[in-house]
Amino acid sequence: MAEVKYQADSSKIVITGITEKPIKIPSQMYPLTGDLNYISHENTEDFPDNPTTEKIKEIYNSITPGVGTCYSNIEKLVDALEKEGIKVQPMVGWVFLGGSLPVHHCFAVIENHILDFNPNFDSLYTEENANLGIDVLRDKLTDAMIELRKKPNSETTAFGKASKMALYIASPCKPQAGLKVYQKLMKAFPKHPCYRNIFEGTNETQRMFFKKQGMI
């Protein structure tokens, strides 16, 4: 497997070693809606211990996030936070997890704190798991997803500090505008490399997750 390399400046990032051709963000195939922002474990922080954080946590934990519905998840969160007078910025762009293909994604930030309902799988990124076959790893991943969803969002997702394995490349954007960007992208590139395993709007991991819970 080729080494994943990132070459970045203030206006673009080029990633090699994931796909045959370099991934360039922003570009026609990997668009952004505005200025490029890099968000990672290194430049995010845990929320401070104060009453405002407790209110943010209460609202964050009150949302039941759907799987594969990041745009509507963040729209609900932003609406709830803004009703309480809390300033929050929705973001739309691309997230890389552990050097894998990027996924178009919607999340939110409050200053240098991230809010992302994606489960935090840092504990699964081990040398042992790296050597597992994709089907075995997917089975292990979905079991972990089911267990994590039994706990408060703030304990199992990126609440404040980003995952060590995640790199976000995104721009400020309202969730529904981000969804339109995604839909336009899929129409222009129906065989987009990041969605080559998508079927009826879900990927194989998400389908296994739904099947284990009797939802399909």
Stretches with model-predicted labels:
Residues 2-216:
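A structural boundary/capping signal
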